[in-house]
Amino acid sequence: MEEGFQKIKKDLSQELLGYVKQSSPRFFERLVVDLLLVMGYGGSRKDAGQAVGQSGDGGIDGIIKEDKLGLDVIYLQAKRWENVVGSKEIRNFVGSLVGQKADKGVFITTSGFTKDALEYVKTITHKVILIDGDMLTQLMIENNIGVSKVISYDIKKIDSDYFAEE
């Protein structure tokens, strides 16, 4: 049963990634902001997240204000790409963080990251989280973004305490 469940999740993840890749860049930027808000970043405020991506956006596609005053901000970069993201793109994003006087960022792509990109984020003082297409869809499924529940099953077992005679 577990094997079948995992296959369904994998198939759903692949189908969901297909939908995300077909979406417009603007929709994708809004999606990543929505996802981080649903995950609890920005607290319960409705105005905590904003998609800001456009030409001349300085390499920032979205922002999440973690507190009411906006003193602590997470900056987002969203790339709806087929090719893997390299360390050059991550360095550019870190440069954008420096330009914003920020120290936290999340770089999300529909593809993946090169080994160099993964290694680069380990060497910098800025806190940058990389989310690839697989992790993106996993987080979307876990947080019910772009998916809906169809059916659920309760698996039961014998309650041996009930049958214990005194």
What are these regions (language model features)?
Residues M1-E166:
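Mixed-charge (Asp/Glu-Lys/Arg
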